[in-house]
Regions:
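Double-stranded beta-helix
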Residues: 24-47, 51-52, 107, 146-151, ...
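Short beta-strand His + acidic residue motifs that chelate non-heme Fe in jelly-roll/DSBH
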Residues: 135-136, 180, 186-191
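Bacterial N-terminal signal peptides
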Residues: 8-19
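Structural motif
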Residues: 175-176, 184
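His/acidic/aromatic-lined binding-pocket segments of jelly-roll/cupin-type domains
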Residues: 115-118, 124-127, 169-170, 177-178
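A short, N-terminal "cap"/entry segment at the start of jelly-roll beta-barrel domains
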Residues: 18-116, 210-219
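Bacterial N-terminal signal peptides that target proteins for export
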Residues: 1-9
Length: 219
């Protein structure tokens, strides 16, 4: 009898601290979030007619000032580029107002790759669900321009865009995953047909927790 009681006390002594430790801290969320395939498909369907579209489904509060954004991204073929934008005074004024980022140089290397992106505060995880292509990663940004856009639902916070120097290319196909820390270059060098991929973005103090994409928001 004593042994049974002692075992019970020992078990309680072990389990109670674990239960207390596992409780969410005050002010942190206490419920889980489900994002259905139907919701993701609904958002993706609105993107297919566009060359590039990146939309989060939700911005989920995960506690301690952190959020997790789940989105779906569509990119059309890079082999049929759109016409170059018309030059004019408006474009010149906009360029003058941007803040340089990365290394500035008058004569970038001939093998520099356009379309490099980095994010100041967000890690991104990509999971390819359709299509594929050749991505480029790592290296450093040359002649970049800093974006300060920070809408409630993203898809991203501030970052830098420009030329990539010293990057290397990787093939990404359905089922492949790419994880990009803040400040690390990523982009697409070649997309034969299209690529669609889920994005997972943890960030701290960047997005508005609770935001829901209007396409799937309850009316």
């Amino acid at each position: 009898m004593k042994n049974t009681a002692l075992k019970g006390l020992l078990a309680a002594a072990v389990l109670i601290p674990l239960a207390v430790y596992a409780q969410p801290r005050p002010g942190n969320p206490t419920t889980a979030t489900v994002i259905t395939k139907a919701e993701i498909d609904k958002i993706s369907a609105t993107e297919q007619s566009q060359r590039t579209r990146d939309e989060n489904a939700r911005v989920v509060d995960i506690g301690d000032g952190w959020s997790m954004e789940l989105g779906i991204i569509h990119r059309a073929s890079t082999r049929n580029p759109p016409p170059a934008p018309a030059t004019g005074r408006g474009n010149a004024q906009a360029a003058a107002q941007t803040i340089p980022c990365g290394e500035q140089m008058g004569n970038p290397p001939a093998d520099a790759i356009p379309g490099a992106i980095t994010h100041d505060n967000q890690t991104e995880g990509y999971y390819v669900v359709s299509g594929g292509g050749t991505a480029f990663i790592d290296g450093h940004v040359v002649n970049g321009r800093h974006s300060t856009a920070n809408p409630d639902g993203g898809p991203n916070g501030p970052g830098c865009g420009g030329l990539a120097v010293g990057s290397h290319k990787v093939e990404l196909k359905v089922g492949d995953v790419l994880i990009v820390p803040p400040g690390v270059i990523h982009g697409w060098a070649d997309i034969p047909d299209h690529v669609d991929y889920l994005s997972f973005r943890p960030s701290h103090g960047v997005m508005k927790n609770g935001w829901v994409n209007p396409t799937i928001a309850s009316k």
